[in-house]
Amino acid sequence: MELPDLGFRPTIGAALTRAAAEFGDVDYVVTNTDRITYAQAERRSALLARRLLAHGVGKGTRVGLFYPNGTDWVLWWLAASRIGALVVPFSTLYAPGELAKGLRLGDVHLLIAPSRAVSVDFAVFLEDALPGLATNAGTQIAVREAPYLRQIWITGGTDRRWAHAVDFTDSVEDVVPQEILSAVEAEVCPADPAVMIHTSGSTADPKGVIHSHGVLMRQSAFLSGTMNGFAPPGLPTRYLSAMPFFWIGGILHVTGSLHSPLTILTLARTEPGAALELLERERGTGIAGWPTLTQRMLAHPDFSRRDLSSCPSLVDLPADLSLVAVPGNVPRHRSLTESGGGFSTTDVLVVDDTGEPVPAGSEGELWIRGPGIMLGYNKREPWEVFDADGWFHTGDRVFVLDDEPGIFYVGRSTELIKTSGANVSPKEVESVLDRHPSVQSSLVVGVGDGDRGQEVVAVVVPADPGTFDADQVSVDIRRDLSAYKVPRRWIVVTADDLPLLTSGKPDRRELTRRIEAGLIADGR
């Protein structure tokens, strides 16, 4: 398969150097409180990279980032990427227990976090996540919950003895010389692992998906053409990125914008009123995100009062529009059950249950392979991830059309729940519920929902039906589960109420059908 010629070495560092040289004065990332140009991003991330090198961080070192969307996230991501470190971004939606699990599964050596963001005191949060942390002091820490973790850097000031306080000043103390950084960057190659993203899967533990520099740069190359297509004539492309930077959609935005002079508008928390204000102030020309945000923006009372003439795609098109990038500059009008987009340098196959290809227009499971996909899963051997012919079986139910470049998403072959664009593993939620003293056993299923795609529903056999309190259980499990994973509906049953397969295992499909048909009532 022929790989596209990007005009530069496909690494994040090389792309940044080129961007700073060719359009350095253009805004790269703009928030409601801060902004950086491409040139500023290059200069400031270089200083941070030199500081990382001075502290022993280098190629392959696993660096965790625990920041919301913003310029700080981008600067640390660039700094670590430039020296070949493996960036492990963590969801700011995580509960303390989830962060501890991510640090352990990801073998993270260095964690970088702000002192406070989105009303969260991260020092307190980290001490809750890692109970042994508070007793640590000095430059090297050791906690049983995350055995590889040796350093935690905090920006914005901290009084914790276990933390190393860092800032974004131009001080050249505590850094290696510039020529060392240049020599290090020359050794970073497209094949090097660049990022590991933890995503919910069919197992209780999240999977660490590893992508290389080359894959990220090639897969994101289409973004500039697509987003430029939404900008009115004469206006620079400035689009609202409503995807979290700690997930693959957001990472493709920050990498894709390095290809041409695009400006990313983003918020630490994407609230529709604040998004409308930012779009108006910055003359935003498009939106890249899930359709639920677009719908909420259109329904917001400030929508009619904002001057959004620079963003005709939001003003003129239907309420369920989501501007999703697809190759060939094709904007796609889509609902929650459709997804525009193809894959660069990737073979795509849609197959039936026997593995045979299905004709265009027919639903099947999506298989992908080639140089455009992930390197693999963390701590998994290749044969555990790919089949003998190199295909990755995604578990996504899709269809394609002869005259369309996109892939249309229908649902999941697996039990994975997709709610408001996020994946939820039923087994992960069940493992937390089943540890709760009020729960004898549980089943978690996804039930169709018009706004979210699917709603997380817990079917619980309580330890004591007379005292079971779903509201209290919801509060209790938030230490170990992100808010979007906490069930929104609770159904209390007896063990005899659960439909079973001939094997004696619960029949999840039949259970879901009964809930959707109203044959099993909600209860607390």
Regions found by a protein language model. Give the residues of each.
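Conserved AMP-binding/adenylate-forming core of the ANL superfamily
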Residues: 4, 8, 17, 27-78, ...
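AMP-binding/adenylate-forming catalytic core of the ANL superfamily
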Residues: 50, 94-103, 111-113, 287, ...
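AMP-binding/adenylate-forming catalytic domain of the ANL superfamily
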Residues: 150, 482-503
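Conserved AMP-binding/adenylate-forming
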Residues: 192, 262, 312, 320-406, ...
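Conserved AMP-binding/adenylation subdomain of ANL enzymes
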Residues: 217-238, 246-286, 300
